[in-house]
Design a protein with these regions (language model features):
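Flexible helix-coil transition and linker loops at the boundaries of alpha-helical arrays
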Residues: 24-28, 58-62, 92-97, 128-142, ...
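TPR alpha-solenoid repeat register
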Residues: 70, 102-104, 137, 145, ...
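Terminal, low-structured helical/coil segments at or just beyond the last alpha-helical repeat
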Residues: 20-23, 30-31, 160, 164, ...
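TPR/TPR-like (Sel1-like) alpha-helical repeat modules
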Residues: 95-99, 111, 122-130, 205-209, ...
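N-terminal leader/linker segments that initiate helical-solenoid repeat arrays
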Residues: 19-72, 81, 89, 264-272
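Structural motif corresponding to the intra-repeat A-B loop/turn of tetratricopeptide repeats
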Residues: 47, 81, 113-114, 156, ...
């Protein structure tokens, strides 16, 4: 029953508005949260940066001080304006009130925006301890939280553990997101496992190819002394980038992101040799 209620709550939640299925609170006989939820549901919609937006959620908290979606909703405005201290205070309160509903969002933001890799690992693994490894996706929909966790380990220097997490994830039936083979290929490349790296990049090409994948493929060919394949890959990377097919997140710099200038410089080096 608890799992069903959790699904009802999460399935209708919105990152921007933190709206929940009010009936789930009713099913749990949580009248306080139900009334706060219904108030938000009926209240006029406001842009997140307006005072009225915060007044609305403050009123919901007056109705029910434990209504954790209000803290999450209010925090989003501070995240967007760069007031990360206030964002963290609000999200900490949301997590305190309902860890299962909020650890995913706080953990993802610590990874995506703050580069707080140890904090992100702590949040994601705390959530996984309860719901299992398949804890869902990050807020941009491109990364499974387990893959984000692996990248956090990479960024704190634990590449072997990052590789193991990704390999285990690929052996499961869990969804992977857009870039797992790309990131795994880079990890193999950084560890000098060039054949494995190339295999991962080829798998990425079959699933979803983009400029950065071809860029790193060219580096692997270079390391393997395959100059013709290297040229073809870097040429394709440049062409693909100019076609607009590359990693893109309008809110943050992504791990393993490569920019056009880097592709152009590598292209120039390859064809001058």
């Amino acid at each position: 029953m608890r799992k069903l209620l959790l699904i009802l709550l999460i399935s209708t939640s919105s990152i921007a508005s933190s709206q929940y299925n009010c009936e789930a609170f009713k099913m749990m006989e949580d009248t306080c949260k139900y009334e706060a939820c219904k108030y938000i549901e009926k209240a006029k919609k406001y842009f997140q940066l307006r005072k009225e937006y915060h007044d609305k959620y403050n009123r919901a908290l007056e109705i029910c001080p434990d209504y954790h979606p209000a803290y999450k909703a209010k925090s989003t405005a501070y995240l967007k304006t760069g007031d990360f201290i206030t964002w963290m205070k609000l999200m900490n309160k949301a997590v305190e009130l309902s860890p299962l509903d909020n650890l995913d969002y706080r953990g993802w933001c610590r990874f995506q925006f703050f580069r707080d890799y140890k904090g992100a690992i702590e949040d994601i693994e705390r959530l996984q301890d309860v719901v299992g490894v398949n804890a869902g996706f990050g807020q941009n929909g491109m990364y499974h939280l387990n893959v984000a966790r692996a990248l956090c380990y990479k960024m704190i220097g634990e590449r072997t553990k990052a590789i193991q997490i990704m390999e285990d994830h690929l052996q499961s039936d869990f969804m992977t997101g857009l870039y797992i083979q790309y990131h795994l290929g880079i990890l193999y490349y950084e560890e000098g496992q060039f054949e494995k790296a190339l295999k991962a990049f080829e798998s990425q090409t079959k699933e979803y190819d983009f400029a950065e994948n071809e860029y790193y493929k060219s580096l692997v060919y270079k390391a393997m002394n395959q100059s013709e394949e290297q040229k073809q890959a870097i040429k394709k990377s440049l062409e693909t980038y100019k076609e607009g097919v590359f990693m893109n997140d309008v809110y943050a710099h992504q791990v393993d992101k490569i920019y056009l200038i880097e592709v152009e410089e590598e292209y120039a080096r390859v064809f001058q040799e």
